[in-house]
Amino acid sequence: PFALSFDHLKKICDIILKRLPNVKIMTMASRVTNIKNKTIDQLKELRKMGITELHIGVESGDDWTLNRIQKGYESNEIIEQVKKLDEAGISYWLTFLNGVAGKKHSYNHAINTAKIFNQLNPIVVGTGGLTLFPDTELKKETELGEFDPLTEKEMLEELKIFLEKLECNARLITHHTIAINLSGNFLEPTLSS
């Protein structure tokens, strides 16, 4: 995982390339904070070693929501860190977590996340739906009335707002946790005749 230090990742890549010399592509999960501890030169070196794509769990581009879910960064840092990947030649997916802001902040979550994503160059925008698991802090907050989760219909409305504002040239993939399965290149601009 990209959470490891540059030196540790480099050692792992060396081992992989020695044992499997035909490997050309390595993909891994990442957080925005995992990019922060790597310089552009280090990212370029990791790209040369075969780390070609990251799947970044952004979840939201809304500062209130990012703080609420304790991501450990603000929206401006998403842009700053992810643009380092563009410069290093590493492609990336960005994820939007549908429903994570709750009812009161749903609109801002959708709008502000689209605004952030529109400033970046993801190859894929992935969306997943919030699932409240037993024995989690968010489930307890829901039971105490401190968090008001979206209904399935409200989640689709939030997703619609997000997609209407999304203008980046990327493929869209929805996770099975969303009530509607969407996949395709329909975010790409259409050519007028």
Feature locations, PLM:
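Short, small-residue-enriched loops and turns at beta-alpha junctions
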Residues: 2-5, 32-36, 99-105, 133, ...
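Acidic (Asp/Glu)-rich catalytic clusters
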Residues: 13-21, 43-50, 83-87
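Conserved C-terminal portion of the radical SAM core fold
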Residues: 76-138, 152-176
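Mid-domain alpha/beta scaffold segments of enzyme catalytic cores
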Residues: 7-12, 16, 38
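Alpha-helix N-cap and loop-to-helix initiation/capping positions
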Residues: 4, 8, 41, 70-77, ...
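Core AdoMet radical
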Residues: 1-6, 20-37, 51-78, 123-126, ...
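Radical SAM enzyme core and accessory elements
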Residues: 181-193
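Short, glycine-/aromatic-enriched active-site segment of Class I SAM-dependent methyltransferases
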Residues: 138-146
